[in-house]
Amino acid sequence: KKLISFNKINETMVVQSGMLLSEIHAICEENDMLFPLSLASEGSCTIGGNLATNAGGVGVLYYGNTRELTLGLEVVLSDGSIINLLKTLKKDNTGYSLKDLFIGSEGTLGIITAASLKIFQKPKEKFTFLASSRSPKKSLEFLRMIQKSTSIPLTSFEIMNNNSIKTVLKNIDGAILPISEEAEWYILIEFSSYEKNLDAVDRINEIVNLGLEKKIISNAVFANSKKQSKQIWNLRENISEAQK
């Protein structure tokens, strides 16, 4: 498992499929870049597994799933022959997109051994908050309202039920729910700004207040620090672990 190439100008990287997702994140972090596929299991899952299952992750709403983040593949077929599709060209409209057959096929068509991935500029700022709502329908209504109300990139919108949050609070040390009133549903929302936006907080506050006034959401708490943001994300990322 190794990094084959990293091109900050072209915003691409080529890696072997055995690399952990967390290792890819670390390489991008060192170079002030971002690979936006993000999963709670990133410390143990490989990019090859992510490709084989076409993983979505918490950034799928804005960046797309793994298929949308992949430019090319190297694949070994059942007869041992190797297909090299490791392109790094973004505007490539030639021929069949064979990579799309292998992504999500779970190894049934061939074994993915390397991949060309898209990387992105790292956001300058992130704004995280946790809201509560009465139902999934109300949560989706809030999503539509956000999408209509601002051009600030909405990079995460995760709906979580009360039972899942209770399980995390019970079984994960240090887990904290920043909203004082219990709710049936919770929404983790994160905006990312790729330039310093002095009006972003005010605009997001306006949207949240409108959601509260219209009773689309019941409550909302902003993360005022990276520590508070991490506490909110820990609720979402530990749901699977808390159920073991």
Cite the ranges covered by each PLM segment:
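Noncatalytic alpha-helical scaffold of FAD-dependent oxidoreductases
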Residues: 1-244
